[in-house]
């Protein structure tokens, strides 16, 4: 679990739920550590302010390489907002300076000069993501989330649908597969415990 000055935003309820279902949280710093911790079975890149530390993140080439190699080997991973930004090829800050990031997502993330997304949303998960091999359910599975960012991506993902609860306005978002879930929304795990169980099951299979 990334935790330092650049990656510091996590809902406490989310961490409690991970631990409740048996996860052991191992902390590391994409800013200060040389590589990922040994013998981990999953990766959590939370929100924060990578744009304020983009130069230091770029300079830590060994960590960027460590994360890219781990995800290329299908280490189960969750990345939200700042963590999602870090996975891009590049990040361009508000001064227009472009920095190299982890290079996992072949896309650019850049400051837009205005608030891109703000507020609560419900994220509809891909059919069967958390229950592989089951019959189609009548109601799509959803998890509550929140977005607040001035940056945008040239590849926001199209595997989920985010919907505003009041207006009903919706848009595609998030890169999701059997081993990763990356996007701008900050998910609230207690709204869908099945999602947490799904991720932890993936980490167990990676042992």
Which residues fall in each region the model found?
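Cysteine-nucleophile active-site neighborhood
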Residues: 50-129
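Short coil/turn connectors at secondary-structure junctions
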Residues: 21-23, 39-40, 73-74, 98-100, ...
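Amide-donor transfer/coupling interface in amidating biosynthetic enzymes
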Residues: 1, 15, 111-207
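Short, glycine-/Ser/Thr-/acidic-enriched flexible segments
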Residues: 4-7, 32-33, 49-51, 84-85, ...
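Structured core elements
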Residues: 1, 26-27, 44, 79, ...
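Phosphate-binding active sites in nucleotide-utilizing proteins
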Residues: 6-59, 65-70
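Alpha-helix N-cap/helix-start motif
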Residues: 11, 36, 95-98, 192-193
């Amino acid at each position: 679990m990334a935790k330092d000055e650049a990656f510091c935003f996590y809902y406490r309820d989310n961490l409690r739920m991970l631990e409740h279902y048996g996860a052991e949280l191992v902390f590391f710093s994409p800013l200060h550590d040389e590589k990922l911790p040994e013998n981990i079975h999953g990766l959590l890149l939370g929100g924060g302010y990578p744009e304020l530390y983009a130069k230091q993140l770029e300079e830590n080439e060994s960590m960027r390489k460590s994360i890219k190699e781990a995800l290329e080997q299908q280490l189960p991973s969750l990345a939200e907002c700042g963590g999602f930004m870090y996975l891009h090829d590049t990040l361009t800050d508000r001064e227009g300076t472009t920095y190299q990031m982890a290079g996992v997502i072949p896309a650019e993330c850049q400051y837009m000069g205005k608030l891109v997304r703000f507020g609560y949303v419900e994220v509809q998960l891909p059919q069967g993501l958390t229950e592989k091999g089951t019959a189609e359910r009548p109601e799509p599975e959803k998890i509550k989330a929140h977005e607040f960012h001035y940056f945008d991506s040239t590849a926001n993902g199209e595997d989920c649908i985010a919907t505003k609860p009041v207006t009903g306005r919706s848009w595609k978002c998030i890169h999701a597969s059997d081993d990763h879930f990356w996007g701008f929304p900050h998910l609230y795990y207690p709204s869908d415990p099945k999602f947490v169980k799904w991720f932890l099951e993936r980490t167990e299979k990676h042992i």
